[in-house]
Amino acid sequence: MNKTNKISIIGSGAMATAMAKVLYDSGNTNIFIYGIDEKELEDLKIGKNAKYFSTDIKLPSFNTTKDLKIALDKTDYIVLAIPSIFIQATFLEILKLLNSKVLVISVSKGFYPNSFLSIHEGLSKDSKSNEFVRGVVTVTGPSFAEEIIKEQLTTICAVDSNIKNAQEVQKLFSNKYFKLYVQSDVIGAEVGASFKNVLAIFSGIANQQGYGINTLASILSRGLKEMKLYNDKVGGKLSTLLGLTGVGDLILTATSPLSRNFSFGKEFVINKSKALETVKTVEGLKALENIYRSNKKYGLDLPIISSLYELIFENISLEEFKEKIWNRTLKSEFE
């Protein structure tokens, strides 16, 4: 790995900007950012991104372009940092333009569009026959772009069944404030990434209704039980759920107003119609839908998932939602 290798970041939003800074601070000097928002790209050229971060925060000056072909020309690494609803269409365009061997790195969360596939699975499937793609690595774990930019100490994971690829990404990103661990359990990591967004919606709802830490602890622990049941069924490892991509990301996402999913839950209580207008950027909604539908064939007892689905997609009332969650049969904790 050479620190002058070209890195193409796809996206110019908050997380894309944070990843660009991390990579720069890790000694990488040849970074190109592709985006479609002219103002964001102009800002990034002069060391800021005012749409997402305070102008008091000074960033490196980056090469930017609205031309995907220029961004990808003779690149070595592609970092996908765009909303999941756009990722497949964008990736299929990328595959047509490649002219060099690349390692694809995804920091996008959620499911592959119009499928039950995780993003990692979808990217791997679509690039399987492409001669230029040498692998796909998912970078995931507890991290808000707003804190990464401020160089808050952050640890997440590089995940791939090919550990050498994961280790390569680990070295590419790690620096004095941003540290990657490697792991090979793609399934478990993706289950954690999906479930934590769903549970963050629930915790946001509870928070807005005035419930406190007792309730939050119940949501997280009972939600983790459902996450484990689902993870066991689809073949993930328990150890993964107990690590950064499971419990770690759950604590972050389900307890902070910086989380779009937590904020969606709060807004849902205040103004449901307005909240649902943000559906494209709330990854937990698609995750909820996919987990609920896939569980139709598994038949697992997932009361949080089923009740939350009925609340958001089948319009039961908040009071009915509470009754479904709370008034269940008394039984042993681990039944």
Curated annotation (Swiss-Prot):
Q: Which GO terms describe its molecular function?
A: glycerol-3-phosphate dehydrogenase [NAD(P)+] activity; NAD binding
User: What cellular component terms from Gene Ontology apply here?
Assistant: cytosol
Pfam families assigned to the protein according to its UniProt record, in alphabetical order:
NAD_Gly3P_dh_C, NAD_Gly3P_dh_N
Query: Where does this chain mainly localize?
Result: cytoplasm
In terms of superkingdom, the source organism counts as Bacteria
Q: What class of enzyme is it?
A: oxidoreductase
Query: What are the catalytic residues?
Result: K196 (proton acceptor)
Q: Name one GO biological process term.
A: carbohydrate metabolic process
Family according to the record: Belongs to the NAD-dependent glycerol-3-phosphate dehydrogenase family.
Name of the protein in question: Glycerol-3-phosphate dehydrogenase [NAD(P)+]
Task: Give the species.
Answer: Mycoplasma mobile (strain ATCC 43663 / 163K / NCTC 11711)
